[in-house]
Amino acid sequence: GDNQTLLVWSGEQMRTFYASGMYENKSSQNLLRQIDYFSNKHKHLEVARRMYANRFPGLDMSGMNMNQMRGAEGTRMKKLYQKLASEYNVQWNNRNYKSQDFDAQDDINKALTYGNHLLYNVCHAAIITLGFSPAIGFIHSGSMRSFVYDIADLYKEFITITPAFRIMSDGYHVDLGSDIRQAVRAAMQKNKLLKCVTKDLYKMFEIDNAPETLSTGIWDNVITYQEFQSKTLWGQKNTI
């Protein structure tokens, strides 16, 4: 509290996100702005358009409604999966996510599911750190993590999808979870994920003076108690 530090209760290596604790003097300004934009029909649609515009650079989406944008995104994702499958010579049928039966998925879908969960958890922590609500989504709805899914979708192509196909092109994996975790972590660092999330969130809600990056170190300090004792992270020295 004295150091204004966000505490996150998570599974090992951020595989799951259970809860968080925030210092009591944290400003609610960003949350109130998010609520204002969510409750205003025009502003709500504009936020959604800004999200989709990130994935369609150069395309004028000003006249498109939500269904049209969702349709365009669905087509884009289908083509992306097919392109990467061809590029990395990975067998691909379709995205087959089974939340209740992880083992029923083929290996490429397992890799995508695992990588996406890691991305969700880091985005969740970033959203809370910046004072927004993970539940108030503008494209997704009906979940306590709707906004997490909104934000994570901005970065999946480079953070989880491409690394997953690249990993699968290497052949058999003794520990697929470990391999995809390391690949996603490397992609997050290479693409400066937290800096992008911060910039995009402030741009989305037209907030000036966005911080250069998060000041709470939610990436550097996501460690278990055992890792804290041994001063290691992700199987190597904690020097990130």
Segments and roles (model prediction):
Residues 1:
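N-terminal, positively charged regions that mediate nucleic acid binding
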Residues 5-9:
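Short hydrophobic alpha-helical runs that function as membrane-insertion/retention elements
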Residues 14-240:
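Active-site helix-to-loop segments that bind/position phosphate- or nucleotide-bearing substrates
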